A protein has these predicted regions:
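Ubiquitin-like/PB1-type beta-grasp interaction modules and other compact soluble beta-rich domains
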Residues: 1-79
């Protein structure tokens, strides 16, 4: 029983992969525990967003993923 993590943009570079499977269920603290180093720090930044099965979470600390879910980690958007 797993949850698929998808790392978009520069978060994929920090994670060293575009996708990774982790054990379900997965909450915010479990996600932080799974992601160590620069990727873990980046995910905790206010501007980094999380989508659960394609829907952006208003409060990423409310993450509650179960087996078969996809959690996408979105880097801050920049532009001019």
């Amino acid at each position: 029983m797993t949850v698929k993590l998808v790392f978009l943009g520069k978060l994929g570079d920090l994670a060293g992969t575009d996708e990774r499977s982790v054990e379900a269920p997965l909450g915010w603290q479990g996600l932080i525990d799974e992601l160590q180093g620069p990727i873990g720090e980046a995910v905790q930044q206010d501007r980094t967003r999380i989508a659960l099965n394609g829907a952006l979470l208003a409060d990423k600390t409310a993450l509650n993923a179960v087996s078969g879910d996809e959690v996408a980690l979105l880097p801050p958007v920049s532009g001019g």
